[in-house]
Amino acid sequence: RFTRRSETPDDAFPLRLRLLSEAELVQIFIAHAHSQPDLRQVDRSVIEARLFTWKALRQPQNVPGIDAGEVGAIARFWRERVPASRQQMDDNLWYQFAQLLPSLDLSARASAWSLLWGEQQELTRQWLALAHILHQTGNARELAAPLSLLVDNFALPTDGFLTPDIDVEGEVVVHPRAENQLQNAASIPLATLALLTRELVLPAVDGVLDNVDIIDIPTPAPQDNPPLWQSKCRWLLDGYRQQLQPDVMMICNATASRTETAGTAKALVSWVKETQSGQETALPGLVWAITLHDGRF
């Protein structure tokens, strides 16, 4: 996100990273699981039995990270992704989820969410590890990070954070931000931080309008058994749609093959329906940018 509306940065930690929430992480894992052709749906009887068991695990107070409203958003996303004939959860079960999950600890919540991706143990372990990092930051929505995340000592781009297809090791020290104040530092593995980052916020030095942000939404080409980072990138448009963003979307690249057209069109139509007024006098919200290098012509 390029913005003119940027607070005065900390010299040692000038970068701003906006993180996924726990609920958004669940949505990404749902999307990731449903990119697999052989996903097994959990039977309703199993879900009911699990819910009965988890009721005994309620904590005296709600555990930070998710609330009933966010569970409702997950339910809507799940229903959009799963064909009606394969849905094993109705309104009653989702209501029980919304009432129960905010009062469960993180491990129990991971077991509950795993019902939405066929109780695949590897996915559940991966989700739980990422969710633990979110809790380590105090469920902060924003972090302050050092410039070394992007460039080296010679101001040259570094591999890793912006190139998720490259395996990187090491950790980076960041500070959660709350009420414009830096909180206690946390050390997070670089690859994990890249997965949990929803937006990298950069200052726009020059701009026509001071109150306009520009968001670059990456769109990796679909592939069989995609890695998690690709599923996250392809989920981003859904995430912005749920927030009724952006005001205007500009399509700057073509699909790599005709087989991708139907899925891409469905995502764009869904975005238009939820974010645009539909009035004939309204300015267009979906715009195609045509360049000399456009693959469509």
PLM regions: where:
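Switch II (G3) loop of P-loop NTPases
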Residues: 1, 18-22, 209-232
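Inter-motif core of Ras-like GTPase G domains
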Residues: 224-256
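P-loop NTPase motor core
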Residues: 1-129, 255
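Amphipathic helical hotspot of TIR/SEFIR-family domains
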Residues: 258-282
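Long, low-complexity, polar/charged, intrinsically disordered or flexibly structured peripheral segments
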Residues: 67-223
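Conserved beta-strand/loop subsegment of P-loop NTPase cores
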Residues: 247-252, 278-296
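Short acidic, S/G/P-rich loop/turn micro-motifs used as interaction or catalytic elements
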Residues: 220-222, 254-260, 293-296
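Conserved catalytic network of the ASCE P-loop NTPase/AAA+ motor domain
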Residues: 6-9, 205-208, 240-245, 278-282
